[in-house]
Amino acid sequence: MNETAKKLLVTGATELGLHLTSAQLGNFYTYASELTKWSKKINLTAIKTDEEIALKHFVDSLTLAKVVKNKGRLLDIGSGGGFPAIPLKIVLHDLHVMSVDAVEKKVIFQRHVARLLHLHDFEAVHVRGEELAKSHAGQFDWIVSRAFSDIPTFAAMTLPLLKSDGRLIAMKGRGGRDEAEAAKGALDDLGARIAELLEFRLPVSGDSRYLVVMEKVAD
């Protein structure tokens, strides 16, 4: 990562209330380097520059620290190159993370990065999200997705995997508020509701971001 990208990462994390240690920064630099290297061979991300990686992958992923705590079990559905799972795991080291993607090459990359960074309690799994219900019903405190699907589809797939007091978090960009509003009827039919809608902007770029936080409705 170049110096500009490093400063963007530090600034963005600080604005989120995260003060990255030198070890954590080193992990992010290694991750960025491997992402750039592997992306020349396989389709991990359309984002190529160090600055965009710092903001649109790393800082964007870290916005989840507004909701996710440093304990419990988190599932990331459709994680691609490891976002938001790996950035979150770097800063929330006590969190147990399962990162799932249907593309095997992307999962292999995530496992490679996890080994390099010595990430404990991190599991990258090659499986479709629909196939998890039988083996992982009711096991997760948080289930997250970033640009994986629309909100009702995400909720329908993942609610069976959520603990009774757990949270689903859909990461959305511009238009997230309208999408959340439009999903309320479908969520009600599924036995879920929006517990919180967090709105903020990424540093420097000012791009809009929303965290749509959902919960099960008590029987």
From Swiss-Prot:
UniProt xrefs under HAMAP family: 16SrRNA_methyltr_G
Residue numbers binding S-adenosyl-L-methionine: 78, 83, 129-130, 146
Disulphide bridges, residue numbers: none
Compartments it resides in: Cytoplasm
First-level EC class: transferase
Family stated for the protein in its record: Belongs to the methyltransferase superfamily. RNA methyltransferase RsmG family.
Organism: Geotalea uraniireducens (strain Rf4) (Geobacter uraniireducens)
Protein name as catalogued: Ribosomal RNA small subunit methyltransferase G
Keywords: Cytoplasm, Methyltransferase, rRNA processing, S-adenosyl-L-methionine, Transferase
Cellular component per GO, a single term: cytosol
Gene3D superfamilies: Vaccinia Virus protein VP39 (3.40.50.150)
Job of this protein: Specifically methylates the N7 position of guanine in position 527 of 16S rRNA.
A GO molecular-function descriptor: rRNA (guanine-N7-)-methyltransferase activity
Catalytic reactions of this protein: guanosine(527) in 16S rRNA + S-adenosyl-L-methionine = N(7)-methylguanosine(527) in 16S rRNA + S-adenosyl-L-homocysteine
EC number in record: 2.1.1.170
Origin superkingdom: Bacteria
